[in-house]
């Protein structure tokens, strides 16, 4: 039999009655225990007195009959009366005497205690229902994320023959990171000439920066293409060489696969190293002994930076460092780089570094004068892979809150001509079609005749827009108005060599070369000033660009000759006579439209994807105001023999070609959007849907068209696009299309200019109107497909919101414990919270999310007229979307309760996983201990039943660990150690609770188990930094982190864990001080929901504060004294209020 006597708290009006409650376990007759000894006089059972009862009990074997039980009762009563009379010592000074007597002297209290100590595995029906709902929602999200609304990818793997030359001269004399990082030069075998004496530095320097845990070898795809393209093409173009084009020398930074995405100090170290590398690279070109040096060209003063993933952030950080050489960087291209926000917010240094770097760039571009802007000559291009990138949300690649359109932009790979495919996080560094565009754009911006090695900023931006944008954007530049007349066209009066269309007549050509010799088709340009405005659209399957030498078609814009006053009188260099010697002829002076040609994917009956490896279409689009100085659009068929192909051109009214919609999101959800286009319609139609701008929703588009009676020129094609950032997706041969976008996303900072994404999505439709059939479009919200969009946008929420639930559960456990003395299980407390505090808190958070979204919309609308001016940049609150859901749309209020349900289910799953782990380890422990046969529990109640280490050894171990934290190891390592120790404590507590069937041991186990669950949810915040530290050890980098050695960030955790290893239960508090515990846990819960996503690193520190308060309760519940401190350290029984276990019988393990 196990006795559990407990002294009563001091009562100013003592009563002369003593009650004894006997609790027998009917399931196991060998286990009986005295539950309580209650008396009015203050008392405490001392260990020496407790052994008297145990000695009497141990006189024979374990008793199981009623007679034996009666003997035990008599022994207990007589012994208890003697103890009560001789031990007037109060146990809990913070406990209310009246409340204790009221709770402990009633039969109802005993029933409550029995109910409170039920099996921790038991799950109530309500908790089970919520958990099943959470699992169902999570399953839908995962299925949708992996299988629905997934963008197709069409990257082809390139081939290369790499050689990496390590620059050993870049040693510790040049940088303090020489032993940790490295610098390489890429050479293509069989193409680049190099030797040990001459490594072949003759071109423009480019430095590739890998991303998080990335290798410098990821830059080989770009470097190989640069070598091959210059070797095979450019070196034979003398005109290009005269304009300053040279080869590219690709250098690569080796960061030893360091993890800058998890640690801010690592990011700063890499940026410092890159600046040292830039200085060294430029010094190689300044060496007068360098072979092949051209004395007629200036030495380079800048290096082009290309960054992948976090390498792009390193590139931007370079310009903010103290060792940065002014103007050593003026061009930065980044791929899948999270510019707007850090990928995770678990490290304070990383969050602060992001904030400082972004503020620097915003401040620089907010300056009114160029002289005050250190980034005036810098161009920054951010390229995103789209939905296929499952590492970095492509929303984070946006530059809209950092850089004005004059200095940079964000574009998606699905937008880039002749790429037209989404990419994942890794393939964007090697995709064959994409790398070709990158390299060709770099060759177009370099100019070795300038010391900067690049063209002026405006010219660079023009080149990048030409290569990376579709050419149909509002900001797209048209080269035609700025060009000189290049062709003098002479036409005869015969109809065989030319045809002149009527005003507003459409031109359709099916096949070319129907006659010998060229034939011209003249489309009169309508006079300007009409309402509505008109625009020209021309589409053909023939090549029209200037790089095509054997073109079958030419498109010219012509005026009468001689020119009118005010126009250039320079005679054209090309004379094209199609008159056939006719006496009466028409002479026109013309400009070619070849430089304004837009490439579009081919759309035929066999087309599947835009990135199919087939020749593209050529498209021209001009507003009428761009054609005011011309009279004719002339299409010249130059094919000498019959040649298959087609062309369609027309002038259309904007009222017919642009269809605005005013449908709201609510109506779109209920009824969808249906548009019927008539048979007589323009070839190109723009459908604008401003209500669709959120990146959280996905849609389904259905296009239904009538089969063409004759030969169809092309199948319907749809371009889905938004303007901020530049994201376009092409759907060829379209019938059904999955629509998703990267528009307004959660937690994104406001734009520094007009928010183009807020204008919504648009659909540009190309259809063959010659089929004379109507066309039906249907757009509906894809609810199931939209669920998967939550995974990437709110992935940190799934770590922050569960901490809210755990905090409320612990708060409920302490409330019940302070009232009854029983620390209920995690599942019991969760059941109570679901019935009380959790719904109320999530309801309040829902109203808060709606009000925040409404207020943000109001403020953004009121500030929008001045948003673009530099003078108002400082008033923009770039942290406006950091709270809660991070959304400006009140429509998504339902996400708060949705995440609440998921969080509850996640906590239940983690709780059961932890319990399975604890019981599995306990079973292993039992097996190991069973080899020793019988185990004798120490008869002394103040000896630890958990750990065999002495107090002195525990103090020494803790002090040594704290010393290491202060000097060498990060506190995150100590936290992981604390989690392991707490796990072992849970295993010990669980084993003793099962073996003794004691309510006190059950309470202690529930307490340490809940603390362990709390620590588990903080563990991911600390593990990532620990991974960085372990990686540094692996590469023999022993320099300690500067910001992760705060002893006070781990001291409360270590003290609490060490205290719990002694088996000491936290004292009850029934005074007003108990409300501090409740407030602290509620504050942790509220912060987890409101700021947990943006500032997740603070969750550790707030939890640390809560733990410090619990440590204070352990140490100073009876007032500050060395005696209380010694009691906590040496107490070992795990019984509440420091009462010892008096069961000293010998027991054999099962």
From Swiss-Prot:
EC assignment: 3.1.-.-
InterPro entries in the record: AB_hydrolase_fold, PGAP1-ab_dom-like, PGAP1/BST1, PGAP1_TMD
GO BP: endoplasmic reticulum to Golgi vesicle-mediated transport; GPI anchor metabolic process; protein transport
Segments passing through the bilayer: 122-142, 790-810, 829-849, 890-910, 960-980, 1010-1030, 1047-1067, 1079-1099, 1102-1122
Region Disordered, residue ranges: 1-43
Active site, UniProt feature: 309
Cellular component GO terms held in the UniProt record: endoplasmic reticulum membrane
UniProt keyword list: Endoplasmic reticulum, Glycoprotein, Hydrolase, Membrane, Protein transport, Transmembrane, Transmembrane helix, Transport
Membrane topology per record: Multi-pass membrane protein
Residues annotated as glycosylated: 16, 28, 818, 870, 942, 1124, 1130
Top EC class for this record: hydrolase
Molecular function GO terms recorded: phosphatidylinositol deacylase activity
Compartments in which it is found: Endoplasmic reticulum membrane
UniProt xrefs under PROSITE patterns: LIPASE_SER
Family that this chain belongs to: Belongs to the GPI inositol-deacylase family.
Matching PANTHER family: GPI INOSITOL-DEACYLASE, NEGATIVE REGULATOR OF VESICLE FORMATION-RELATED
Name of this chain's protein: GPI inositol-deacylase
Origin species: Coccidioides immitis (strain RS) (Valley fever fungus)
């Amino acid at each position: 039999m196990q006795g559990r006597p407990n002294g009563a708290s001091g009562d100013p009006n003592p009563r002369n009655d003593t009650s004894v409650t006997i609790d027998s376990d009917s399931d196991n007759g060998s286990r009986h225990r005295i539950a309580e000894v209650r008396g009015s006089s203050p008392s405490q059972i001392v260990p020496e007195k407790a052994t008297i009862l145990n000695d009497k009990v141990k006189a024979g074997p374990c008793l199981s009959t009623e007679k034996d039980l009666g003997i035990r009762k008599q022994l207990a009563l007589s012994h208890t009366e003697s103890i009560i009379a001789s031990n007037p010592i109060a146990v809990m000074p913070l406990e209310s005497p009246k409340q204790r007597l009221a709770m402990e002297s009633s039969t109802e209290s005993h029933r409550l205690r029995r109910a409170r100590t039920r099996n921790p595995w038991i799950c109530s029906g309500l908790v089970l229902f919520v958990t099943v709902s959470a699992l169902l929602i999570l399953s839908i999200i995962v299925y949708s994320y992996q299988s629905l609304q997934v963008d197709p990818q069409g990257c082809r793997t390139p081939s290369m023959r790499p050689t990496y030359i390590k620059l050993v001269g870049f040693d510790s004399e040049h940088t303090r990171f020489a032993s940790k990082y490295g610098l390489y030069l890429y050479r293509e075998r069989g193409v680049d000439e190099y030797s040990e004496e001459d490594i072949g530095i003759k071109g423009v320097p480019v430095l590739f920066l890998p991303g998080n845990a990335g290798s410098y070898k990821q830059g080989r795809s770009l470097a190989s293409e640069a070598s091959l393209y210059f070797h095979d093409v450019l070196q034979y173009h003398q005109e290009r060489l005269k304009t300053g084009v040279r080869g590219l020398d690709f250098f690569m930074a080796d960061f030893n696969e360091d993890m800058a995405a998890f640690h801010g100090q690592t990011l700063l170290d890499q940026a410092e190293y890159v600046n040292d590398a830039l200085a060294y690279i430029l010094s190689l070109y300044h060496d007068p002994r360098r072979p092949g040096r051209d004395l007629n060209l200036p030495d380079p003063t800048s290096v082009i930076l290309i960054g992948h993933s976090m390498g792009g952030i390193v590139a931007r950080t370079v310009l903010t460092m103290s060792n940065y050489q002014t103007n050593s960087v003026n061009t930065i291209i980044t791929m899948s780089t999270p510019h707007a926000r850090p990928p995770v917010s678990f490290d304070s240094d990383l969050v602060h570094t992001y904030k400082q770097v972004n503020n620097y760039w915003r401040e620089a571009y907010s300056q009114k004068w160029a002289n005050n802007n250190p980034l005036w000559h810098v161009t920054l291009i951010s390229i995103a892979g789209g939905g296929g990138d499952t590492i970095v949300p492509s929303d984070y690649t946006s530059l809209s809150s950092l850089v004005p359109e004059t200095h940079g932009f964000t574009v998606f790979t699905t937008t880039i001509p002749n790429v037209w495919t989404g990419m994942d996080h890794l393939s964007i560094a090697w995709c064959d079609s994409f790398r070709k565009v990158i390299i060709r754009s770099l060759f177009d911006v370099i100019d070795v005749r300038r010391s900067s090695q690049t063209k002026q900023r405006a010219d660079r931006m023009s080149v990048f827009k030409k290569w990376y944008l579709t050419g149909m954007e509002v900001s797209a530049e048209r080269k035609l108005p700025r060009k000189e007349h290049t062709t003098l066209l002479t036409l005869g009066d015969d109809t065989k060599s030319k045809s002149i269309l009527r005003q507003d007549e459409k031109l359709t050509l099916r096949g070319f070369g129907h006659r010998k010799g060229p034939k011209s088709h003249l489309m009169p340009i309508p006079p300007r000033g009409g309402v509505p405005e008109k625009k020209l659209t021309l589409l053909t399957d023939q090549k029209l660009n200037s790089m095509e030498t054997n073109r079958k078609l030419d498109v010219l814009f012509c005026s009468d000759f001689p020119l009118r006053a005010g126009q250039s009188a320079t005679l054209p260099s090309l004379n094209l006579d199609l008159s056939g010697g006719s006496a009466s002829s028409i002479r026109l002076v013309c400009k070619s439209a070849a430089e304004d040609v837009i490439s579009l994917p081919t759309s035929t009956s066999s087309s599947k994807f835009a990135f199919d490896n087939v020749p593209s279409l050529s498209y021209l689009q001009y507003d009428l105001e761009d054609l005011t100085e011309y009279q004719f659009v002339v299409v010249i068929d130059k094919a000498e023999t019959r040649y298959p192909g087609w062309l369609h051109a027309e002038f259309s009214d904007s009222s017919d070609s642009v269809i605005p919609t005013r449908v709201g999101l609510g109506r779109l959800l209920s009824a969808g959007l249906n548009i019927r286009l008539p048979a007589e319609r323009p070839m190109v139609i723009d459908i604008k849907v401003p209500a669709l701008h959120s990146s959280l929703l996905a849609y389904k588009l259905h296009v239904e068209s009538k089969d063409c009676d004759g030969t169809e020129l092309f199948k319907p094609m749809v371009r889905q696009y938004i303007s901020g950032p530049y994201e376009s997706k092409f759907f060829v041969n379209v019938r059904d299309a999955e629509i998703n976008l990267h528009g307004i996303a959660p937690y994104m900072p406001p734009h520094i200019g007009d928010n183009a994404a807020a204008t919504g999505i648009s659909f540009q439709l190309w259809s063959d109107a010659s089929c004379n059939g109507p066309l039906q479009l249907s757009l509906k919200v894809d609810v199931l497909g939209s669920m998967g969009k939550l995974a990437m946008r709110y992935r940190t929420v799934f770590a922050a919101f569960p901490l809210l639930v755990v905090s409320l559960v612990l708060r409920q456990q302490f409330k019940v414990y302070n009232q009854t003395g029983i620390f209920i299980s995690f599942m019991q407390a969760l059941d109570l919270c679901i019935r009380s505090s959790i719904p109320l808190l999530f309801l309040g958070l829902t109203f808060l999310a709606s009000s925040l979204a409404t207020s943000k919309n109001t403020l953004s609308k009121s500030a929008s007229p001045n948003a673009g001016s530099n003078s108002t940049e400082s008033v923009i609150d770039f942290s406006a979307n950091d709270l809660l859901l991070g959304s400006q749309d009140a429509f998504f209020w339902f996400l708060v309760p949705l995440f609440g349900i998921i969080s509850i289910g996640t906590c239940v799953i983690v709780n059961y996983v932890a319990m399975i782990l604890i019981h599995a380890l306990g079973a292993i422990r039992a097996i190991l201990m069973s080899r020793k046969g019988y185990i004798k529990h120490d008869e002394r109640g103040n000896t630890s039943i958990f750990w065999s280490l002495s107090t002195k050894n525990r103090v020494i171990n803790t002090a040594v660990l704290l010393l290491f934290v202060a000097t060498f190891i990060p506190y995150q390592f100590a936290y992981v150690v604390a989690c392991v120790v707490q796990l072992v404590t849970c295993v010990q507590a669980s084993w003793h609770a099962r073996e003794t069937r004691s309510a006190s041991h059950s309470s202690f186990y529930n307490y340490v188990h809940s603390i362990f669950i709390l620590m588990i949810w903080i563990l991911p915040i600390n593990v990532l930094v620990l991974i960085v530290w372990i990686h540094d050890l692996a590469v023999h980098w022993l320099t300690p982190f500067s910001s992760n050695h705060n002893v006070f960030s781990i001291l409360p955790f270590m003290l609490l864990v060490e205290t719990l290893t002694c088996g000491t239960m936290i004292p009850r508090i029934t005074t007003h001080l108990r409300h501090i515990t409740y407030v602290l846990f509620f504050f942790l819960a509220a912060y987890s929901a409101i700021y947990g996503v943006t500032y997740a690193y603070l969750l550790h520190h707030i939890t640390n504060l809560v733990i410090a308060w619990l440590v204070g309760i352990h140490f100073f519940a009876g007032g500050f004294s060395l005696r209380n401190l010694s009691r906590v350290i040496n107490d070992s029984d795990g019984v509440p209020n420091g009462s010892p276990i008096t069961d000293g019988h010998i027991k054999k393990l099962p």
